[in-house]
Amino acid sequence: MMNHPHSSHIGTTNVKEEIGKLDRIRISGIGLIAYAFMAVLLIIAISTKTLPNTMIGAIFALVLMGHVFYYLGAHLPIFRSYLGGGSVFTILLTAILVATNVIPKYVVTTASGFINGMDFLGLYIVSLIASSLFKMDRKMLLKAAVRFLPVAFISMALTAVVIGIVGVIIGVGFNYAILYIAMPIMAGGVGAGIVPLSGIYAHAMGVGSAGILSKLFPTVILGNLLAIISAGLISRIFKDSKGNGHGEILRGEREKSAAAEEIKPDYVQLGVGLIIAVMFFMIGTMLNKVFPGINAYAFIILSIVLTKAFGLLPKYYEDSVIMFGQVIVKNMTHALLAGVGLSLLDMHVLLAALSWQFVVLCLVSIVAISLISATLGKLFGLYPVEAAITAGLANNSMGGTGNVAVLAASERMNLIAFAQMGNRIGGALILVVAGILVTFMK
């Protein structure tokens, strides 16, 4: 019996329709068919060890993993609602895949080399800081900074006291709770936080810093993870609350900033924005060499705030920076989250350190700093939700990458400058205070 030509035509049409349907599912702008092809390519490259140990290899792996894991986390019911959505899911899943050796160590080295070695993280953060600060109204920026910093610093001090008191109650002692939970969790991450902190402790105690670092590291990991989850929860629970600024930090300023015009992308200006952002990074780095006691990011933020306050940069350049920042955020945030999970979240170290007292103290830190910063934020004229996230939870996170994850989970990326401000300046203060305290508490 002969096949009717019309039926084969219908079959082909149906297949095309099905493919069309699948391709309409978009993962960060990429159709599912194209994504599946690239994912297979990545799996083959990793398993045959042909993934280049270069920027190209890192971008291919991190972007593909980051986008798909974020998409899954943003659509899974429990993660979406209670566990920080795509941000936490991406970080956790990549960390678990590394811990179970599904992702080989050489891929971790490639990813870490790109993010930390070549300092893509630095480019990402400076682009984000510059774009979010230049986007703000000049008067509003200065008003917000003056109110924000006291909230961040007082919150950190009061939280440390609360942690110490709870330490006494649960039997680990005031000194231990302060030195091994409060200080590392608020020190501003790993490189600028617990690494110098371990050196300070080692010098005062007359021991090696490696042993102390392994004691401090789990605190930063768990604190960071809890901060990300809490940021997602707070923004979700208080979605319709009057205390929610929906991304604006200063009370009563929401209506003003909503009227800000949308900047149309321009290819040449994108390149201009890149080099202006990098210029501010260089200013911060060079000033840090002259004054090594002050973190480079503190100088970067200060130089941008002063440039904005005195109107030193023409609007064309400001718009260019804003434009470039948007491109980086929209395309590379998920990749960066995957990089955090691959290279910074060591599940073995975290699980080995888990005791009920340790978990309780980390939880106390999160709850205390959220409540205190929200309350103080309200008193100082900030939106409590934004204050809790930027002046509170960001100061319990893993520095730059932690800030990105906390703000991604709460969908408040535009507040990166405030998160960095509290984290970097607050972290530096913590190191100074820890240096004094450790001599009495050791």
From Swiss-Prot:
Top-level division of the source organism's lineage: Bacteria
Gene Ontology terms for molecular function: antiporter activity; organic anion transmembrane transporter activity; symporter activity
Cellular component GO terms held in the UniProt record: plasma membrane
GO BP term, example: citrate metabolic process
Listed transmembrane segments: 27-47, 59-79, 83-103, 114-134, 151-171, 177-197, 209-229, 267-287, 293-313, 321-341, 349-369, 387-409, 421-441
Any one Pfam family match given in the protein's UniProt record, by short name: 2HCT
InterPro entries membership: 2-OHcarbox_trans_Prot/Firm (IPR018025), 2-OHcarboxylate_transport (IPR004679)
Induction trigger: Constitutively expressed at neutral pH values. Expression is increased at low pH. Magni et al show that expression is not affected when L.lactis is grown on M17 medium with or without supplementation of citrate. However, it was shown later that transcription is higher in the presence of citrate. Expression is also induced by amino acid limitation. Expression of the cit cluster is controlled at the post-transcriptional level by mRNA processing at a putative complex secondary structure and by translational repression mediated by the CitR regulatory protein.
Activity regulation: The transport of citrate is unaffected by the presence of citrate in the growth media.
Membrane topology: Multi-pass membrane protein
Major subcellular location class: membrane
Catalytic activity: (R)-lactate(in) + citrate(out) = (R)-lactate(out) + citrate(in); (S)-lactate(in) + citrate(out) = (S)-lactate(out) + citrate(in); citrate(in) + H(+)(in) = citrate(out) + H(+)(out)
Keywords: Antiport, Cell membrane, Citrate utilization, Membrane, Plasmid, Stress response, Symport, Transmembrane, Transmembrane helix, Transport
Compartments it resides in: Cell membrane
PANTHER family on file: CITRATE-SODIUM SYMPORTER, NA(+)-MALATE SYMPORTER
Entry similarity comment: Belongs to the 2-hydroxycarboxylate transporter (2-HCT) (TC 2.A.24) family.
Record's function text: Secondary transporter involved in citrate metabolism. During cometabolism of citrate and glucose, catalyzes the uptake of divalent citrate into the cell coupled to the exit of monovalent lactate, the end product of glycolysis in L.lactis. The citrate/lactate exchange is electrogenic and results in the generation of a membrane potential. Plays an important role in resistance against lactate toxicity at low pH. In the absence of glucose, i.e.
Protein name in UniProt: Citrate transporter CitP
Species assigned in the record: Lactococcus lactis subsp. lactis
Encoding gene, per UniProt annotation: citP
